[in-house]
Amino acid sequence: MDRLVKTEFNEVNLNFQKNQKCSSSFKLTNLMHTMSVAVSLTTTNPTTFSINKPLSVIPPLSSSTYTLHLTNLNQPPLSEPADVITVRTSMLPTGKATTDDLRRLFNKPGPHVFRDAVITVILVGPTVAEYVISNYETRNLFTKAISVCTKSNLTNLMKPAVESGKVEYVTDLITAGGDVNFRDSNGKSLIPFAIRTGKLAVLKLLVANGCRINDSVDFVLHEAAIIDRVDVVKFLFESFCDELDVNSVNREMMTPIHVSASEGHVSLIEFFVSIGGNANAVDSRRWTPLHHAASRNHLKAVEFLLENSDVKYARELNGKTAFEIASESGHTRLFGVLRWGDALLQAARVDDVHALKKCLGEGAEVNRKDQNGWTPLHWASFKGRIKSVKVLLEHGAEVDSVDDAGYTPLHCAAEAGHLQVALVLIAHGGCQTNLKSFQHVSPIATFQKHVSLHYSTKKSETFA
């Protein structure tokens, strides 16, 4: 005979409750027609699990019910592999035995003891499911845990599953009956929580199963701005185009561009601006996106916003410009673009060498361009400010920098008739003579009758 008893099931489900005594029952049946069977039940984790009748006797063709108890715990005692109950049996011709008799019987190894069954202990319920979401990647544990959950349990598990970014768990909950249109105590849908994970697959799964948003609460574009995901933003517009506004504001009156600027996410700022986002918008503190980028020392964001907004000198509620905000925080690398750049251009225009050197010493970018692509060297050359030209060149100014129309500083000097400036530029390598914007007319042609320039040009060619 292979075994003396049979189990009702190969698994026993134990619905775990945090910090409570938990129990579950299972049944064994004696297969012997005329003889009683002694039964020994042991668990792989006796400090956690106990059985009400670890040693017992089952009469012929009878059944006995046993109860598995779990001690008070604040988290489910999951293990891989799972804990089990081992069922050992032995024939008992006398039909009766004391506990000590049974203990001696099973303590003595031999062919009289059968290993009839192994019953797997399965921890189930919403508490177990939530614990698995946070701590395990094992889908089998999760599907078993939710097998006894109510629809309400399943729906409440949707948020932690979405927050985990584990698309398989979200799929299992939806399949089992979880409501994708769950809303938390603040009225938020599952969409913002999916966005925060950065898992586009979870987001697509929710949308495909009918999850809707209320953007007056969800602020999905703001959420996407935080994680710097243009692909997520594009998907949101594809899915909820009639419900989204690129200039929508959150409770602080910040637009998605404000948030992107605060995080320094230039690619998203560019995208939002490209679809109509207002780079000049102000929030509840009258901060522009430029104020936010400056406060967080995001140079690339500051540079982009300076080129795509008109708020360089805008003042917030306390009267501070973006430069003053950056200055208070000690973000010295922003000083050049937010302030010294303008001062540098002005100094170059008026030939204020002292101011020029001060700006450069404070960190102004020597090749910083204005709205027309003119560098300080363009301005100094055009104005004939030879002292400024020399200082700028000494500090690394690009002699052949090209503006938006294709002009170099040498072109500017030539058009304005500043011979000495042109000579200085040529001496520093400024000899671009064939730019398309001039229809192949060299700026040197402007001075071709000037003997000193002609000699200088020939001399440079001779020693080249």
Swiss-Prot record:
Topology in membrane: Peripheral membrane protein
Signal sequence segment: none
SUPFAM superfamilies named in the record: Ankyrin repeat, PapD-like
GO cellular component, one term: cytoplasm
Predominant location category: cytoplasm
Cell compartment(s), UniProt: Cytoplasm; Nucleus; Cell membrane
Keyword set includes Lipid biosynthesis: no
Protein name as catalogued: Protein VAPYRIN-LIKE
Known tissue expression: Expressed in roots.
Keyword Cytoplasm set for record: yes
Biological classification of the source: Eukaryota, Viridiplantae, Streptophyta, Embryophyta, Tracheophyta
